Amino acid sequence: MLDREGFRPNVGIILLNAHNEVFWGKRLREHSWQFPQGGIKYGETPMQAMYRELHEETGLLPEHVKIIGRTRDWLRYEVPDKFIKREVRGHYRGQKQIWFLLRMVGRDCDICLRATDHPEFDAWRWNEYWVPLDAVIEFKRDVYQLALTELSRFLRRPAQRTDKSRGPRAPRYPRVSNGHAASETPAVIDASAVCSEVEPGASTLDEIPPRLILRD
């Protein structure tokens, strides 16, 4: 479903935790990271599409989040021709998005990247609100910056921009195989099996590894 200008209606989701850190998902079998997003189906409202995409990409349900705000209007980005299927070139230009800012009220272990048979992400992490966008595919960076800037007014305490040169940090969780941490590339742990907990007094999530708590 395209509008007259060739843009597909879409929703984007910025998901916050209690520390004003944002959820990033690593695209399946790729090296780029992004926020959850997806197209609005015929007959859906942006809010309905947001809740559907939230569940499909993160496993979260409406009771796990609280809507903090949304963008006033559509934000658009164009997709380079090399990423557009040949049959729709000349018609499809890109995405126009309504962005939602959500506060997670559930727990980290409510997140499940395998909620559907067609997952979008194979790892996830929390990161600073104003983290540099180097790990985001280039043609989406401007609209990400616009969405983050517009929605930052809804934060409990304004997140401060950072001049740090590093990109988004590594995924929080070590890979687990047969119950033992492995030294391979980090990936998210199956959320149906474990929760994470940070030691009291830690000032950032990077200072110590999370404790892994196996459910009975």
Curated annotation (Swiss-Prot):
* Record key words, sorted: Hydrolase
Q: Which gene encodes it?
A: rppH
Residue window of motif Nudix box: 38-59
Output the Gene Ontology terms for molecular function. Answer: pyrophosphatase activity
- One Pfam family linked to the record: NUDIX
Please name the Gene3D superfamilies in this protein's record: Nucleoside Triphosphate Pyrophosphohydrolase (3.90.79.10)
Domain of life assignment: Bacteria
Family of this protein: Belongs to the Nudix hydrolase family. RppH subfamily.
Chain intervals for the UniProt region annotation (Disordered): 159-180
Q: What NCBIfam families is this protein classified in?
A: PRK00714.1-2, PRK00714.1-4, PRK00714.1-5
The role this protein plays is: Accelerates the degradation of transcripts by removing pyrophosphate from the 5'-end of triphosphorylated RNA, leading to a more labile monophosphorylated state that can stimulate subsequent ribonuclease cleavage.
EC number(s) for this protein?
3.6.1.-
Tell me what this protein is called: RNA pyrophosphohydrolase
> Which cofactors does it use?
a divalent metal cation
Report the residue ranges that make up the Nudix hydrolase domain in this protein.
6-149
Among InterPro entries, the record links this protein to: Nudix_hydrolase, NUDIX_hydrolase-like_dom_sf, NUDIX_hydrolase_CS, NUDIX_hydrolase_dom, RppH
What top-level class of enzyme does the UniProt entry assign?
Answer: hydrolase
